[in-house]
Amino acid sequence: ELNDNILIKVESNVLREWTDKVLMAKNDVSFEISESNFVCSASSTELGKVIHSEPMNGKRIDTVAVRENVNITLSFQATKSMLIFSNCGEMFIIGFSNQQPSRLKVELGDGSYLCLYVAPKNKKEK
C-alpha cells in the first residue's frame, strides 16, 4: 500500500490551472510542497521559470494529511497525464510522495473511483 507524504483535496479546475500553467514550459515539473505552501515550477529557454505557488489550507487546497515535505520532479508527460486526468471528475484527492508514485484519485459515485499513479523522476535522471 502507498503511504503518501502529503495528501490534499482539490477541485478539478484547480488541478487543471496548475498543470496547464507549468506545462507551458514544455519541460519537467518540480513540486515543492510543505505544510504551509504548494509550489510547482518548470523552466524553459523561451519563458524562463514558470512558477505556481499558493498556501496550503487556503481557499483552494484542503490538506488531508502531512507526514513530511515533498520535493519531487515529474516528467513533462506525467504532468500532462495529470492535466488530462483532471477532466474525469470534479474533486480530486492527490497523494504526493518522495519515494513512491504519487496518485490522483477521483470518486465516480456508488463507491467506485478512478486512480492515476505517476512516478517521480529519479534524482539521476534530472
Segments from the language model and where they lie:
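DNA polymerase processivity clamps
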Residues: 4-56, 60, 64-126
